[in-house]
Amino acid sequence: MSKTYHFIGIKGSGMSALALMLHQMGHKVQGSDVEKYYFTQRGLEQAGITILPFSEDNITPDMELIVGNAFRENNKEVAYALRHQIPFKRYHDFLGDFMKSFISFAVAGAHGKTSTTGLLSHVLKNITDTSYLIGDGTGRGSANAQYFVFESDEYERHFMPYHPEYSIITNIDFDHPDYFTGIADVRNAFNDYAKQVKKALFVYGEDDELKKIEAPAPIYYYGFEEGNDFIAYDITRTTNGSDFKVKHQGEVIGQFHVPAYGKHNILNATAVIANLFVAGIDMALVADHLKTFSGVKRRFTEKIINDTIIIDDFAHHPTEIVATIDAARQKYPSKEIVAIFQPHTFTRTIALLEDFACALNEADSVYLAQIYGSAREVDKGEVKVEDLAAKIIKPSQVVTVENVSPLLDHDNAVYVFMGAGDIQLYEHSFEELLANLTKNNQ
């Protein structure tokens, strides 16, 4: 008889992906969360997975409880489990045990984890039976799968229970200033993680901090420059994506196309190619399936409303903002790039205020939403979004969900909405405004 898994905080991106994966493997899955809509819940609802409001009544002693990392003892279900000595596992601890049944491929790094995990999952699942867990809330489970691809998160050192066969590390950057004390602390966390990888590491070779990492397993460096073990070259970036070749030890291992934009996506693809080459996967098959990758949720997700191009992206760090704007310019070289950005957490905004301003100056015009504070912090009044606006050189202003009409002051523009909070509310307001304009003009 299959057990019942109950997820406390099932709408979290990792939690929802894991729930979907276990559901597809034949287990009974349910979960609880806040009532506010989150983009992951559509996939859960389509799978028929029950989402309940938090209640002590949801829990029975025979369930296996998996608790999202954001939920602590003040959550009524967590408190109930502790009070009645009902055991539970945190998401990362459960995952660390779960992956032992597979040959596992991890993707770690400050930026690009979800896109790279999605790309690796897409290619591998089209070649052989593969389970995967992606940070956009997408998961696939197969009881017969030999391989497992997953995203490995550094926040609060959550990746320490993981001992994968292979791991990509895309980059190291100072983020999560509410936890990490500085770049050295971040690097030390990644170094500890790297020591747990069993067969091979694939590391971006043009990242000075990453080059300091040491591990017992072989480290293969990838990038654009000579001296790397896997080198992307002969690069052509067009409005249809990116074409490039990859060589290893002086030998060409393939010519590749990815229907994705920005230099960062060429690097992500090169990391995937390097990993699969070392794992013994046929490069011709890899090239075939790279061509058909359609992206992951909330990573350069495009739609057209009333002939207006809107891009939705999870970018919430200066490095990610620069990469997203670069991708938009590659695909739409003749259009004005209008950035609509919502800072995520007060601690990150304070720590990276100057960097955010520099990154947003890559756009042609900038609109800012109010700072989205996380559940882990309190607004002490130390920073306001207007402080960021004052540092931006390009035309900029603050908008509200109720009034996004200033965005209409642009012709021939692409609107890039970026953030990890509720920036999608601003996007939906703009979409409604565009739709109403269409109705009024008919």
Swiss-Prot record:
Catalyzed reaction equations: UDP-N-acetyl-alpha-D-muramate + L-alanine + ATP = UDP-N-acetyl-alpha-D-muramoyl-L-alanine + ADP + phosphate + H(+)
Xref: InterPro entries: Mur-like_cat_sf, Mur_ligase_C, Mur_ligase_C_dom_sf, Mur_ligase_cen, Mur_ligase_N, MurCDEF_pg_biosynth, UDP-N-AcMur_Ala_ligase_MurC
UniProt keywords (A-Z) are:
ATP-binding, Cell cycle, Cell division, Cell shape, Cell wall biogenesis/degradation, Cytoplasm, Ligase, Nucleotide-binding, Peptidoglycan synthesis
Please classify the protein's predominant subcellular localization into one broad category: cytoplasm
Q: Which Gene3D superfamilies match?
A: Mur ligase, C-terminal domain, Mur-like, catalytic domain, NAD(P)-binding Rossmann-like Domain
Output the GO biological process annotations, alphabetical, semicolon-separated: cell division; cell wall organization; peptidoglycan biosynthetic process; regulation of cell shape
HAMAP family found in the cross-reference section: MurC (MF_00046)
Q: Which family does it belong to?
A: Belongs to the MurCDEF family.
Q: What is this protein called?
A: UDP-N-acetylmuramate--L-alanine ligase
**Organism, per UniProt?**
Streptococcus pyogenes serotype M1
